[in-house]
């Protein structure tokens, strides 16, 4: 009787200790897919068949969950990953020129600049000149030949370019010269005088016979070279002519001067 009571008391104590374990230990719960798969029939399979020969019919796909999971995309902050500045790259090929733009407006006038430095001295300027003016106080009549008109009075003769002995001007420089001749005609006689360049008559001074004597003039410009001669001649007697003058006044004058010198 005591043995039975002892065993009964031990059984009660074990029950007290085992109850918390039974109710406290979690048990595995089958998922919806596992539950469905466990209830679906499987095909016939021999125990000796390898597992990889299982028919596709033996595998049952679990249904898709009705809940859609959100797609998670990671965000990377690029500024955090920015590196150091790289080296300068090589120069590229020049591009094609663009089209010409429209002309801009005229800008305002700039301020006056500073005075520049003085230049180096230039070469000395050479002034070329030549002039003469002579007169005659004696009348002249024509003869059998041409007569060179000589002069007995000098008004101007720079550097002696007019030869008083021959009555001719000798050009000292190449250039353009101006000449003028003034005479007084004789009563009832023609006046027939030429201005001559070397041996060529260039212009004539002429007056018809008249009861009264008058003043006549002629002028001309000539290009000359050094050594050229210009002089005055009276026509020969085949045409009776003459020019008048006296000891009191000078009626006959011959003048000339250089207008512009030319480089040789």
Swiss-Prot record:
The keyword Signal applies. Pfam families: C1q, Collagen. Keywords: Collagen, Glycoprotein, Secreted, Signal. GO terms for molecular function: identical protein binding. Residues 1-24 form the signal peptide. Residues 90-100 have a biased composition (Low complexity). Residues 81-125 are annotated as: Disordered. Glycans are attached at residue 77. It is found in: Secreted. Residues 83-124 form the Collagen-like domain. It comes from the Eukaryota. Residues 125-264 form the C1q domain. GO terms for cellular component: collagen trimer; extracellular space; protein-containing complex. Gene3D superfamilies: 2.60.120.40. SMART domains: C1Q. InterPro entries: C1q_dom, Collagen, Collagen/C1q_domain, Tumour_necrosis_fac-like_dom. This is Complement C1q tumor necrosis factor-related protein 6. It comes from Mus musculus.
